[in-house]
Amino acid sequence: MLLDTIAAISTPRGEGGISIVRMSGQDSLNILEKIFKPKNKKVSELKNYSINYGHIIDNEHIVDEVLVSIMKAPNTYTREDIIEINCHGGYLVTEKVLEVVLKNGARIAEIGEFTKRAFLNGRIDLTQAEAVIDVIHGKTEKSLSLSLNQLRGDLRDKIATIKKSILDLAAHINVVLDYPEEGIDDPVPENLVENLKKASAEIKDLVSSYDKGKIIKDGIKTAIIGKPNVGKSSILNSLLREDRAIVTHIPGTTRDIIEEVININGIPLLLVDTAGIRNTDDIVENIGVEKSKELINSADLILYVIDTSREIDEEDFRIYDIINTDKVIGILNKIDIKKEINLSKFPKIEKWIEISALSKLGIDNLENEIYKYIMNENIEDSSQKLVITNVRHKSALEKTNEALLNIIETIDMGLPMDLMAVDIKDALDSLSEVTGEISSEDLLDHIFSNFCVGK
């Protein structure tokens, strides 16, 4: 247990029904006794896991009418004594309650320190700590489900199973090398080899799940591009089901990048409506055009829009020539008044979708095509199986598997057992990096810096 007691506001700042001021640490109950006056009881008489009505007091003056939750160690979020003060949700009154708590012995918590204490005190491992922030930031049902699986400890348990296979091998080797008089045969037992091969296959599956998992968690950046007034903003509004971007018949209305997130079948899609790309003397519009060109190179998917009510011209081809990826879907907009267009002039685009953004005709087909394009493999059940979404986990697991394959090769070649020692250590260390059993202070600081102060 860490020695000092920390406190912070755990709810968003601003006005609301309630705010929560949270304390964690060995002095939490002592501090509460100084500042809380429960109705008809003493603080020392309050039961564990109870909610208690009363007032926060500062120098005999009432600060606020509150409900106080008491949770005593070790069965708490941090494995320390935790007090949560539910006060009125005004900005000033919440600050006053926190001020009283700090004045009586607590210190302000660092970013993510409550969850960091849960990790340091052994209640959760590092994968579960990372899952906490993923749950908070979850954008869709699928991403939330993956995060909850990890928070539950699914990845931790899988790592433990893989680690046991390696430790069983290490134990066998130690007996053979340290006690030759026992007469144990040198060859590694077949069941240990099979367990190693199974562990390697499981790691390979986890690593290969990363690309899909990252899409489910973070979504993909999708740029809507085309010349001015082809209907890019109307397409954005149609996909959003609301009027987010200004739509006029005047070319150049969208002068800056507009970003919005939509949910397509459980996949978050960061839609970016770009400024129409054209030659212009307008300084502000020109900045937007340059941003659009940069975005084309960084986008995961491009929606290239053509206005079918007009003839194709040099501007259409100039924008098409900027596209340097095959990750593109062509959109033929305004099909209700379309002209005949020779699509063979756009060989980089294999798939075209006909729509009318104004009347919403074809928008459902566009959404389905975007989803099919992203999910070119069936991952409908990804939320029901173990999927990794963190590049740190992927990198460490790749190192683990490299060491495992070296071990298996050493066994298959019949080489001396002591040659496996380095690879066994590397495999175990890499797995421990995933769970946080081996971690640097810089890594922990980086991970917990993504949290809010009260978490």
From Swiss-Prot:
CDD domains: trmE, TrmE_N. (6S)-5-formyl-5,6,7,8-tetrahydrofolate binds at residues 22, 84, 123, 455. InterPro entries: G_TrmE, GTP-bd, GTP-bd_TrmE_N, GTPase_MnmE, MnmE_dom2, MnmE_helical, P-loop_NTPase, Small_GTP-bd. Disulfide bonds: none annotated. GO terms for molecular function: GTP binding; GTPase activity; metal ion binding. Its EC number is 3.6.-.-. It is an enzyme of class 3 (hydrolase). Binds 1 potassium ion per subunit. Its cofactor is K(+). Mg(2+) binds at residues 233, 254. One of its GO terms (cellular component) is cytoplasm. Belongs to the TRAFAC class TrmE-Era-EngA-EngB-Septin-like GTPase superfamily. TrmE GTPase family. Homodimer. Heterotetramer of two MnmE and two MnmG subunits. This is tRNA modification GTPase MnmE.
